[in-house]
Curated annotation (Swiss-Prot):
Stretches for region Disordered: 1-48
Gene name tied to this protein: miaB
Subcellular locations according to the entry: Cytoplasm
Boundaries of every TRAM domain copy: 433-496
Designated name of the protein: tRNA-2-methylthio-N(6)-dimethylallyladenosine synthase
Amino acid sequence: MTGTSNIPTHGKEHKDAPALLPLPAPNTHHTHAAHPGDPSHDRHPSRGKLFIKTHGCQMNEYDSAKMADVLTTTEALELTDNPEEADIILINTCSIREKAQEKVFSQLGRWRALKTNGRDVIIGVGGCVASQEGETIVKRAPYVDLVFGPQTLHRLPDMIRARREQNRPQVDISFPEIEKFDHLPTPRAEGPSAFVSIMEGCSKYCSFCVVPYTRGEEVSRPFEDVLTEIAHLATQGVREINLLGQNVNAYRGAMDPGPSNNTNPAPPPYADLGLLIRAIAQFESIGRIRFTTSHPLEFSDSLVEAYRDVPQLANHLHLPVQSGSDRILSAMKRGYTALEFKSKIRKLRAVRPDISISSDFIIGFPGESDTDFQKTMQLIKDIGFDQSFSFIYSRRPGTPASNLEDHTPDEIKRTRLEHLQKHINAYAADISKRMIGTVQTVLVEGPSKKNPNELTGKTENMRPVNFPGHPRLIGQFIDVHITEALTNSLRGRVHTN
Protein backbone atom coordinates (compact mmCIF):
# COMPACT_ATOMS: atom_id res chain seq x y z
CA MET A 1 0.00 0.00 0.00
CA THR A 2 1.29 3.44 -0.85
CA GLY A 3 0.01 6.97 -0.47
CA THR A 4 0.34 7.93 -4.13
CA SER A 5 -3.36 7.88 -4.98
CA ASN A 6 -4.77 10.27 -2.43
CA ILE A 7 -5.03 13.45 -4.49
CA PRO A 8 -8.66 14.54 -4.10
CA THR A 9 -10.53 14.91 -7.35
CA HIS A 10 -13.69 16.77 -8.27
CA GLY A 11 -16.95 15.01 -9.02
CA LYS A 12 -16.74 11.72 -7.11
CA GLU A 13 -19.40 9.17 -8.02
CA HIS A 14 -21.02 7.35 -5.11
CA LYS A 15 -24.24 5.44 -4.67
CA ASP A 16 -27.12 7.45 -3.33
CA ALA A 17 -27.61 7.10 0.41
CA PRO A 18 -30.79 5.18 1.22
CA ALA A 19 -33.78 6.90 2.76
CA LEU A 20 -33.94 6.24 6.48
CA LEU A 21 -36.18 8.14 8.86
CA PRO A 22 -38.38 11.22 8.89
CA LEU A 23 -36.19 14.14 9.90
CA PRO A 24 -37.04 15.84 13.20
CA ALA A 25 -38.65 19.24 13.32
CA PRO A 26 -36.38 21.89 14.82
CA ASN A 27 -38.84 22.83 17.54
CA THR A 28 -38.43 19.54 19.41
CA HIS A 29 -35.05 20.44 20.93
CA HIS A 30 -34.80 20.22 24.72
CA THR A 31 -33.99 23.63 26.14
CA HIS A 32 -34.48 25.48 29.37
CA ALA A 33 -33.54 28.94 28.14
CA ALA A 34 -34.40 31.34 25.36
CA HIS A 35 -32.16 31.52 22.31
CA PRO A 36 -29.94 34.64 22.39
CA GLY A 37 -31.65 35.82 19.24
CA ASP A 38 -35.15 35.44 20.63
CA PRO A 39 -37.16 38.56 21.58
CA SER A 40 -37.43 37.24 25.14
CA HIS A 41 -33.65 37.41 25.41
CA ASP A 42 -33.36 40.83 23.78
CA ARG A 43 -35.56 42.38 26.47
CA HIS A 44 -32.81 41.90 29.07
CA PRO A 45 -29.96 44.42 29.06
CA SER A 46 -26.43 43.13 29.53
CA ARG A 47 -25.60 42.31 33.16
CA GLY A 48 -21.86 42.18 32.64
CA LYS A 49 -19.18 40.87 30.33
CA LEU A 50 -17.85 37.36 29.79
CA PHE A 51 -14.38 36.30 28.65
CA ILE A 52 -13.56 32.68 27.73
CA LYS A 53 -10.10 31.34 26.90
CA THR A 54 -9.86 27.87 25.36
CA HIS A 55 -6.99 25.41 25.38
CA GLY A 56 -6.92 22.05 23.64
CA CYS A 57 -9.04 20.06 21.24
CA GLN A 58 -12.13 20.69 19.14
CA MET A 59 -14.28 19.22 21.91
CA ASN A 60 -13.08 22.06 24.11
CA GLU A 61 -13.88 24.59 21.39
CA TYR A 62 -17.38 23.15 21.24
CA ASP A 63 -17.76 23.22 25.02
CA SER A 64 -16.56 26.83 25.18
CA ALA A 65 -19.19 27.82 22.63
CA LYS A 66 -21.81 26.14 24.81
CA MET A 67 -20.55 27.97 27.91
CA ALA A 68 -21.00 31.21 26.01
CA ASP A 69 -24.49 30.19 24.88
CA VAL A 70 -25.53 29.30 28.44
CA LEU A 71 -24.25 32.50 30.06
CA THR A 72 -25.23 34.97 27.36
CA THR A 73 -28.71 33.46 27.39
CA THR A 74 -29.49 32.84 31.06
CA GLU A 75 -27.31 35.56 32.61
CA ALA A 76 -27.56 38.17 29.83
CA LEU A 77 -23.78 38.46 29.69
CA GLU A 78 -21.99 40.07 26.78
CA LEU A 79 -18.93 38.38 25.29
CA THR A 80 -15.65 40.30 25.25
CA ASP A 81 -12.17 39.47 23.97
CA ASN A 82 -10.54 41.54 26.73
CA PRO A 83 -10.25 39.83 30.15
CA GLU A 84 -9.51 43.15 31.84
CA GLU A 85 -13.05 44.38 31.22
CA ALA A 86 -14.77 41.07 32.00
CA ASP A 87 -16.92 40.38 35.05
CA ILE A 88 -16.64 36.62 34.57
CA ILE A 89 -13.46 34.98 33.25
CA LEU A 90 -13.46 31.30 32.29
CA ILE A 91 -10.59 29.15 31.09
CA ASN A 92 -11.44 25.85 29.39
CA THR A 93 -8.44 23.65 29.97
CA CYS A 94 -6.59 20.69 28.45
CA SER A 95 -4.57 18.13 30.39
CA ILE A 96 -3.36 15.93 27.55
CA ARG A 97 0.19 17.23 28.02
CA GLU A 98 2.10 18.45 31.06
CA LYS A 99 3.03 21.81 29.52
CA ALA A 100 -0.62 22.53 28.69
CA GLN A 101 -1.52 21.97 32.33
CA GLU A 102 1.17 24.30 33.65
CA LYS A 103 0.04 27.00 31.22
CA VAL A 104 -3.28 27.07 33.04
CA PHE A 105 -1.77 28.08 36.36
CA SER A 106 0.48 30.62 34.67
CA GLN A 107 -2.59 32.18 33.06
CA LEU A 108 -4.52 32.17 36.33
CA GLY A 109 -1.63 33.97 38.02
CA ARG A 110 -1.82 36.76 35.45
CA TRP A 111 -5.56 37.15 36.03
CA ARG A 112 -5.21 37.29 39.81
CA ALA A 113 -4.45 41.01 39.70
CA LEU A 114 -7.86 41.67 38.13
CA LYS A 115 -9.49 40.81 41.49
CA THR A 116 -7.40 43.23 43.55
CA ASN A 117 -8.87 46.52 42.38
CA GLY A 118 -12.19 46.18 44.16
CA ARG A 119 -14.04 44.55 41.24
CA ASP A 120 -16.01 41.40 41.97
CA VAL A 121 -14.49 39.41 39.11
CA ILE A 122 -15.36 35.72 39.07
CA ILE A 123 -12.66 33.39 37.72
CA GLY A 124 -13.62 29.85 36.69
CA VAL A 125 -11.62 26.84 35.54
CA GLY A 126 -13.31 24.23 33.36
CA GLY A 127 -12.25 21.36 31.13
CA CYS A 128 -9.98 18.41 31.73
CA VAL A 129 -7.54 20.03 34.16
CA ALA A 130 -10.54 20.94 36.30
CA SER A 131 -11.74 17.32 36.25
CA GLN A 132 -8.30 16.00 37.06
CA GLU A 133 -7.33 18.45 39.79
CA GLY A 134 -10.70 19.40 41.34
CA GLU A 135 -10.38 21.21 44.66
CA THR A 136 -6.58 21.13 44.33
CA ILE A 137 -6.97 24.06 41.93
CA VAL A 138 -8.58 26.17 44.65
CA LYS A 139 -5.87 25.18 47.12
CA ARG A 140 -3.12 26.11 44.67
CA ALA A 141 -4.92 29.21 43.40
CA PRO A 142 -7.34 30.32 46.17
CA TYR A 143 -8.58 33.26 44.11
CA VAL A 144 -10.34 30.85 41.73
CA ASP A 145 -14.12 30.93 42.26
CA LEU A 146 -15.44 28.08 40.09
CA VAL A 147 -14.09 24.65 39.12
CA PHE A 148 -16.30 22.65 36.76
CA GLY A 149 -15.88 19.67 34.45
CA PRO A 150 -16.88 19.16 30.81
CA GLN A 151 -20.11 17.43 31.89
CA THR A 152 -21.21 20.18 34.30
CA LEU A 153 -20.81 23.34 32.23
CA HIS A 154 -24.60 23.65 31.99
CA ARG A 155 -24.64 24.24 35.77
CA LEU A 156 -22.56 27.41 35.49
CA PRO A 157 -25.47 29.82 36.22
CA ASP A 158 -26.26 27.97 39.48
CA MET A 159 -22.58 27.82 40.43
CA ILE A 160 -22.16 31.56 39.85
CA ARG A 161 -25.19 32.35 42.00
CA ALA A 162 -23.98 30.02 44.75
CA ARG A 163 -20.54 31.63 44.68
CA ARG A 164 -22.04 35.10 45.12
CA GLU A 165 -24.52 34.06 47.80
CA GLN A 166 -22.17 31.86 49.84
CA ASN A 167 -18.98 33.81 49.16
CA ARG A 168 -16.91 30.65 48.73
CA PRO A 169 -15.55 28.68 45.75
CA GLN A 170 -17.82 26.21 43.99
CA VAL A 171 -16.46 22.89 42.70
CA ASP A 172 -18.50 20.47 40.56
CA ILE A 173 -16.54 17.93 38.55
CA SER A 174 -19.10 15.12 38.59
CA PHE A 175 -19.94 12.97 35.56
CA PRO A 176 -23.73 13.24 35.12
CA GLU A 177 -23.46 11.40 31.78
CA ILE A 178 -25.36 13.19 29.03
CA GLU A 179 -27.45 15.50 31.24
CA LYS A 180 -25.81 18.71 30.02
CA PHE A 181 -27.24 18.42 26.50
CA ASP A 182 -30.80 18.59 27.89
CA HIS A 183 -29.99 21.89 29.61
CA LEU A 184 -28.25 23.81 26.83
CA PRO A 185 -29.87 26.65 24.88
CA THR A 186 -30.95 26.20 21.30
CA PRO A 187 -27.80 25.77 19.18
CA ARG A 188 -26.55 28.95 17.56
CA ALA A 189 -24.69 28.89 14.25
CA GLU A 190 -21.65 31.07 13.70
CA GLY A 191 -20.88 30.54 10.03
CA PRO A 192 -21.58 27.81 7.48
CA SER A 193 -19.70 25.09 9.41
CA ALA A 194 -20.73 23.82 12.85
CA PHE A 195 -19.52 21.34 15.44
CA VAL A 196 -21.97 18.89 17.00
CA SER A 197 -20.93 16.74 19.94
CA ILE A 198 -22.45 13.28 19.63
CA MET A 199 -20.76 11.54 22.56
CA GLU A 200 -18.63 12.17 25.62
CA GLY A 201 -15.72 10.34 27.18
CA CYS A 202 -13.68 7.29 26.22
CA SER A 203 -13.61 3.70 27.47
CA LYS A 204 -10.43 2.53 25.73
CA TYR A 205 -8.05 3.38 28.61
CA CYS A 206 -4.89 3.71 26.53
CA SER A 207 -1.96 3.55 28.92
CA PHE A 208 -0.78 7.10 28.17
CA CYS A 209 -4.10 8.94 28.17
CA VAL A 210 -6.00 10.86 30.85
CA VAL A 211 -9.27 11.31 28.92
CA PRO A 212 -11.22 8.45 30.59
CA TYR A 213 -10.31 9.95 33.96
CA THR A 214 -11.15 13.56 33.06
CA ARG A 215 -14.19 13.12 30.79
CA GLY A 216 -15.51 9.78 31.97
CA GLU A 217 -16.37 6.68 29.98
CA GLU A 218 -18.15 6.68 26.63
CA VAL A 219 -21.71 7.98 26.69
CA SER A 220 -23.58 8.61 23.43
CA ARG A 221 -26.31 11.17 22.84
CA PRO A 222 -29.63 9.76 21.65
CA PHE A 223 -29.91 9.52 17.88
CA GLU A 224 -32.95 11.81 17.59
CA ASP A 225 -31.36 14.45 19.85
CA VAL A 226 -28.36 14.73 17.54
CA LEU A 227 -30.57 15.05 14.48
CA THR A 228 -32.68 17.69 16.21
CA GLU A 229 -29.62 19.84 16.92
CA ILE A 230 -28.52 19.49 13.31
CA ALA A 231 -32.01 20.45 12.15
CA HIS A 232 -31.73 23.70 14.13
CA LEU A 233 -28.32 24.43 12.64
CA ALA A 234 -29.52 23.69 9.12
CA THR A 235 -32.26 26.31 9.45
CA GLN A 236 -29.54 28.85 10.33
CA GLY A 237 -27.58 28.30 7.13
CA VAL A 238 -25.09 25.66 8.27
CA ARG A 239 -23.83 23.63 5.31
CA GLU A 240 -21.13 21.49 6.96
CA ILE A 241 -21.47 19.36 10.10
CA ASN A 242 -18.45 18.26 12.13
CA LEU A 243 -19.36 15.40 14.47
CA LEU A 244 -17.30 15.39 17.66
CA GLY A 245 -16.33 12.84 20.28
CA GLN A 246 -13.20 11.66 22.04
CA ASN A 247 -13.84 8.34 20.32
CA VAL A 248 -16.46 9.41 17.85
CA ASN A 249 -16.72 6.20 15.85
CA ALA A 250 -17.71 4.32 19.02
CA TYR A 251 -21.03 6.21 18.84
CA ARG A 252 -24.02 4.10 19.89
CA GLY A 253 -26.99 6.45 20.06
CA ALA A 254 -30.23 5.11 21.49
CA MET A 255 -33.10 5.10 18.99
CA ASP A 256 -36.81 5.52 19.63
CA PRO A 257 -38.22 2.03 18.96
CA GLY A 258 -41.60 3.33 17.81
CA PRO A 259 -44.41 1.01 16.67
CA SER A 260 -43.45 -2.22 14.92
CA ASN A 261 -45.23 -5.10 13.24
CA ASN A 262 -44.55 -7.78 10.65
CA THR A 263 -44.52 -5.30 7.78
CA ASN A 264 -42.77 -2.53 9.71
CA PRO A 265 -39.98 -4.08 11.81
CA ALA A 266 -38.56 -2.10 14.70
CA PRO A 267 -35.30 -0.25 14.10
CA PRO A 268 -32.15 -1.45 15.86
CA PRO A 269 -31.83 -0.42 19.53
CA TYR A 270 -29.04 2.01 18.69
CA ALA A 271 -27.52 3.87 15.75
CA ASP A 272 -23.83 3.56 15.01
CA LEU A 273 -21.82 6.33 13.36
CA GLY A 274 -22.46 4.95 9.89
CA LEU A 275 -26.23 5.08 10.36
CA LEU A 276 -26.02 8.57 11.88
CA ILE A 277 -24.05 9.82 8.87
CA ARG A 278 -26.66 8.38 6.49
CA ALA A 279 -29.41 10.15 8.43
CA ILE A 280 -27.59 13.50 8.40
CA ALA A 281 -27.12 13.16 4.65
CA GLN A 282 -30.92 13.37 4.29
CA PHE A 283 -30.82 17.07 5.21
CA GLU A 284 -30.87 18.70 1.78
CA SER A 285 -28.94 21.77 2.92
CA ILE A 286 -26.09 19.79 4.55
CA GLY A 287 -23.50 19.33 1.83
CA ARG A 288 -20.56 18.00 3.81
CA ILE A 289 -20.12 15.79 6.88
CA ARG A 290 -16.92 15.29 8.89
CA PHE A 291 -16.12 13.52 12.15
CA THR A 292 -13.28 13.51 14.66
CA THR A 293 -11.56 11.91 16.52
CA SER A 294 -11.62 8.22 15.64
CA HIS A 295 -10.11 5.09 17.14
CA PRO A 296 -8.91 2.34 14.78
CA LEU A 297 -10.59 -0.35 16.91
CA GLU A 298 -14.00 1.17 16.14
CA PHE A 299 -13.40 1.76 12.43
CA SER A 300 -16.09 -0.66 11.29
CA ASP A 301 -17.31 -2.03 7.98
CA SER A 302 -20.46 0.04 8.54
CA LEU A 303 -18.34 3.18 8.41
CA VAL A 304 -16.52 2.01 5.29
CA GLU A 305 -19.92 1.44 3.67
CA ALA A 306 -20.93 4.99 4.61
CA TYR A 307 -17.85 6.27 2.77
CA ARG A 308 -18.94 4.17 -0.20
CA ASP A 309 -22.55 5.30 -0.21
CA VAL A 310 -22.68 8.87 1.14
CA PRO A 311 -21.14 11.51 -1.12
CA GLN A 312 -21.61 14.19 1.55
CA LEU A 313 -19.07 12.40 3.77
CA ALA A 314 -15.84 14.35 3.29
CA ASN A 315 -13.02 12.67 1.40
CA HIS A 316 -10.72 12.88 4.40
CA LEU A 317 -10.15 10.75 7.49
CA HIS A 318 -8.20 11.52 10.65
CA LEU A 319 -7.36 8.17 12.25
CA PRO A 320 -4.76 8.27 15.05
CA VAL A 321 -2.34 5.32 14.91
CA GLN A 322 0.24 6.62 17.46
CA SER A 323 2.99 4.14 16.45
CA GLY A 324 3.94 1.65 13.74
CA SER A 325 5.55 -0.76 16.20
CA ASP A 326 3.39 -3.61 17.48
CA ARG A 327 5.47 -3.76 20.65
CA ILE A 328 4.82 -0.09 21.41
CA LEU A 329 1.15 -0.34 20.39
CA SER A 330 0.77 -3.17 22.89
CA ALA A 331 2.46 -1.12 25.63
CA MET A 332 0.12 1.74 24.77
CA LYS A 333 -2.86 -0.66 25.10
CA ARG A 334 -4.18 0.43 21.71
CA GLY A 335 -5.69 -2.98 20.92
CA TYR A 336 -4.53 -3.38 17.30
CA THR A 337 -1.40 -4.11 15.29
CA ALA A 338 0.17 -2.09 12.49
CA LEU A 339 -1.02 -4.73 10.01
CA GLU A 340 -4.59 -4.45 11.28
CA PHE A 341 -4.41 -0.67 10.93
CA LYS A 342 -3.19 -1.01 7.33
CA SER A 343 -5.98 -3.49 6.62
CA LYS A 344 -8.59 -0.92 7.66
CA ILE A 345 -7.03 1.72 5.42
CA ARG A 346 -6.93 -0.78 2.54
CA LYS A 347 -10.66 -1.43 2.93
CA LEU A 348 -11.37 2.29 2.98
CA ARG A 349 -9.29 3.02 -0.11
CA ALA A 350 -11.08 0.23 -1.94
CA VAL A 351 -14.22 2.42 -1.86
CA ARG A 352 -12.49 5.86 -1.76
CA PRO A 353 -9.19 5.47 -3.66
CA ASP A 354 -8.31 9.17 -3.45
CA ILE A 355 -9.14 9.75 0.24
CA SER A 356 -6.56 11.64 2.30
CA ILE A 357 -5.52 10.16 5.65
CA SER A 358 -4.07 12.13 8.56
CA SER A 359 -3.02 10.72 11.92
CA ASP A 360 -1.52 11.23 15.39
CA PHE A 361 1.88 9.99 16.51
CA ILE A 362 3.51 9.79 19.93
CA ILE A 363 7.29 9.78 19.72
CA GLY A 364 9.55 8.61 22.55
CA PHE A 365 7.01 6.45 24.35
CA PRO A 366 8.82 4.65 27.22
CA GLY A 367 10.95 1.87 25.79
CA GLU A 368 10.76 3.02 22.16
CA SER A 369 13.89 1.75 20.38
CA ASP A 370 15.40 2.77 17.06
CA THR A 371 13.80 -0.33 15.55
CA ASP A 372 10.38 0.67 16.91
CA PHE A 373 10.76 4.15 15.45
CA GLN A 374 11.81 2.79 12.06
CA LYS A 375 8.65 0.68 12.01
CA THR A 376 6.66 3.88 12.53
CA MET A 377 8.50 5.50 9.63
CA GLN A 378 7.77 2.45 7.46
CA LEU A 379 4.08 2.71 8.28
CA ILE A 380 4.15 6.38 7.28
CA LYS A 381 5.70 5.39 3.96
CA ASP A 382 3.18 2.58 3.43
CA ILE A 383 0.12 4.73 4.14
CA GLY A 384 1.31 8.07 2.79
CA PHE A 385 -0.21 10.15 5.58
CA ASP A 386 -1.36 13.63 4.64
CA GLN A 387 -0.58 15.76 7.72
CA SER A 388 -0.24 14.67 11.34
CA PHE A 389 -0.38 15.78 14.94
CA SER A 390 2.85 14.45 16.39
CA PHE A 391 4.37 15.02 19.82
CA ILE A 392 7.01 13.71 22.16
CA TYR A 393 5.45 11.52 24.85
CA SER A 394 4.32 13.48 27.90
CA ARG A 395 4.08 11.53 31.15
CA ARG A 396 0.66 12.04 32.77
CA PRO A 397 0.27 11.25 36.48
CA GLY A 398 -2.19 8.48 37.26
CA THR A 399 -1.89 6.73 33.89
CA PRO A 400 -0.35 3.23 33.63
CA ALA A 401 2.38 4.48 31.29
CA SER A 402 3.59 6.94 33.91
CA ASN A 403 5.08 3.97 35.80
CA LEU A 404 7.13 2.70 32.83
CA GLU A 405 10.87 3.21 32.79
CA ASP A 406 12.13 5.59 30.13
CA HIS A 407 15.83 5.56 29.27
CA THR A 408 15.69 7.35 25.91
CA PRO A 409 17.50 10.72 26.00
CA ASP A 410 15.38 13.77 25.18
CA GLU A 411 17.76 14.71 22.37
CA ILE A 412 17.06 11.42 20.58
CA LYS A 413 13.31 11.94 21.01
CA ARG A 414 13.54 15.41 19.49
CA THR A 415 15.60 14.10 16.57
CA ARG A 416 13.04 11.37 15.88
CA LEU A 417 10.16 13.84 16.04
CA GLU A 418 11.87 16.22 13.61
CA HIS A 419 12.59 13.32 11.25
CA LEU A 420 8.97 12.15 11.32
CA GLN A 421 7.53 15.63 10.84
CA LYS A 422 9.93 16.34 7.98
CA HIS A 423 8.76 13.26 6.08
CA ILE A 424 5.03 13.82 6.66
CA ASN A 425 5.37 17.50 5.71
CA ALA A 426 7.06 16.38 2.49
CA TYR A 427 4.15 14.01 1.74
CA ALA A 428 1.65 16.79 2.45
CA ALA A 429 3.55 19.29 0.27
CA ASP A 430 3.63 16.78 -2.58
CA ILE A 431 -0.13 16.25 -2.34
CA SER A 432 -0.70 20.02 -2.35
CA LYS A 433 1.49 20.46 -5.42
CA ARG A 434 -0.37 17.70 -7.26
CA MET A 435 -3.63 19.51 -6.52
CA ILE A 436 -2.50 22.39 -8.78
CA GLY A 437 -4.65 22.32 -11.89
CA THR A 438 -7.45 20.33 -10.24
CA VAL A 439 -10.92 21.63 -9.43
CA GLN A 440 -11.88 21.33 -5.76
CA THR A 441 -15.23 21.73 -4.03
CA VAL A 442 -14.77 24.42 -1.39
CA LEU A 443 -17.13 25.61 1.33
CA VAL A 444 -16.68 29.39 1.41
CA GLU A 445 -16.31 30.34 5.09
CA GLY A 446 -15.76 34.10 4.86
CA PRO A 447 -13.21 36.79 4.01
CA SER A 448 -9.57 35.75 4.00
CA LYS A 449 -7.65 36.77 7.14
CA LYS A 450 -4.62 37.69 5.06
CA ASN A 451 -6.52 39.70 2.46
CA PRO A 452 -10.05 40.93 3.29
CA ASN A 453 -10.66 41.47 -0.42
CA GLU A 454 -10.43 37.71 -0.97
CA LEU A 455 -12.47 34.77 0.26
CA THR A 456 -11.35 31.64 2.06
CA GLY A 457 -12.65 28.12 2.48
CA LYS A 458 -11.51 24.53 2.87
CA THR A 459 -11.17 21.63 0.50
CA GLU A 460 -12.39 18.18 1.46
CA ASN A 461 -8.85 17.27 2.56
CA MET A 462 -8.77 20.21 4.99
CA ARG A 463 -6.59 22.61 3.01
CA PRO A 464 -7.40 26.31 3.29
CA VAL A 465 -7.89 27.95 -0.11
CA ASN A 466 -7.78 31.71 -0.70
CA PHE A 467 -9.24 33.16 -3.88
CA PRO A 468 -10.85 36.32 -5.31
CA GLY A 469 -14.62 36.25 -5.10
CA HIS A 470 -17.79 38.14 -4.26
CA PRO A 471 -19.01 38.08 -0.61
CA ARG A 472 -22.32 36.62 -1.77
CA LEU A 473 -20.48 33.30 -2.19
CA ILE A 474 -19.96 33.01 1.59
CA GLY A 475 -21.81 29.98 2.93
CA GLN A 476 -21.93 28.23 -0.44
CA PHE A 477 -20.12 25.26 -1.93
CA ILE A 478 -18.32 26.36 -5.06
CA ASP A 479 -15.80 24.87 -7.47
CA VAL A 480 -12.34 26.39 -7.21
CA HIS A 481 -9.55 25.84 -9.73
CA ILE A 482 -6.30 25.43 -7.75
CA THR A 483 -3.50 27.60 -9.16
CA GLU A 484 -0.80 27.59 -6.46
CA ALA A 485 0.34 25.49 -3.50
CA LEU A 486 1.85 27.34 -0.54
CA THR A 487 3.29 25.91 2.68
CA ASN A 488 0.05 25.94 4.67
CA SER A 489 -2.62 26.81 2.12
CA LEU A 490 -3.64 26.86 -1.52
CA ARG A 491 -4.56 29.63 -3.91
CA GLY A 492 -7.14 29.42 -6.65
CA ARG A 493 -9.85 31.05 -8.70
CA VAL A 494 -13.57 30.41 -9.00
CA HIS A 495 -14.06 27.72 -11.62
CA THR A 496 -16.50 28.44 -14.42
CA ASN A 497 -17.50 25.87 -17.02
